[in-house]
Design a protein with these regions (language model features):
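ABC-family P-loop ATPase nucleotide-binding domains
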Residues: 1-52
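Hydrophobic anchor residue at the start of the ABC signature
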Residues: 59
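A short, proline-enriched helix->beta-strand linker immediately N-terminal to the Walker B motif
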Residues: 63-68
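Short loop immediately C-terminal to the Walker-B catalytic DE motif
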Residues: 76-77
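Conserved catalytic loops of ABC-family nucleotide-binding domains
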Residues: 90-103
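Conserved H-loop
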Residues: 104-111
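Conserved beta-strand-loop-alpha-helix hinge in the C-terminal portion
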Residues: 123-150, 164-168
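C-terminal coupling/interaction segments
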Residues: 144-187
Length: 187
């Protein structure tokens, strides 16, 4: 494993393609779209990349394996908005099941046909279709007609489609829900 750290990124991409029967060309196409050239990858080792470049390389490798299922951990982290939009296109075109986690709520409007789960404090809630979430709001009280009820910091928060609440898409990050729950508790 230590010897893998000393090889060039382009060789790591080739290795994964060989091991998985993946498409090395697709990995390079995705990375080129994200502004990372093949020549650059031939000149760098993985530890020499920025956090965003490393995230892009790992995501491109995963997508290029064409596996039936892939798991992406925060694939948008450290990417600028333009690169995030390009990556979304590859995710929506992927012919397989993608499980990804993110805190960024603005992304969901681009993943309209996806199922969504929420995880707060180790508890998993869902599924709920993204199209149901687009106009949904967080209500900081128990609502009888809630789409979903979440328990966050010991408080029940309802996800509602009608009524007063904080629109999900108005939150930059789902982490903000903790701050809002605390504010609601004080009022």
């Amino acid at each position: 494993i230590l010897s893998l750290l000393s090889i060039r990124v382009s060789d790591i991409i080739r290795l994964y393609a060989d091991l998985t029967g993946g498409d090395q060309g697709l990995a390079h196409k995705i990375l080129a779209d994200l502004g990372i050239s093949e020549d650059f990858l031939k000149s760098k080792k993985l530890h020499e990349l920025s956090a965003g470049q490393t995230k892009a390389v790992c995501t491109a490798i995963a997508l290029s394996t064409r596996a039936k299922h892939i798991l992406l951990d925060e694939p948008f982290e450290q990417l600028d908005p333009a690169r995030k939009n390009k990556l979304i296109r590859y995710l929506t075109e992927y012919d397989g099941i993608i499980i990804l986690n993110t805190h960024e709520t603005w992304l969901i409007k681009n993943l309209i046909h996806w199922k969504t789960f929420f995880m707060f404090e180790g508890s998993l809630y869902g599924p709920i279709l993204v199209e149901e979430l687009l106009n949904a709001k967080f209500s900081f009280q128990e609502e009888a007609k809630a789409l979903m009820k979440l328990v966050i910091s010991g408080k029940t928060i309802s996800l509602i489609s009608e009524g007063h609440g904080k629109p999900i898409l108005s939150l930059e990050s789902l982490d903000k829900i903790y701050e809002l729950a605390l504010e609601a508790e004080k009022s």
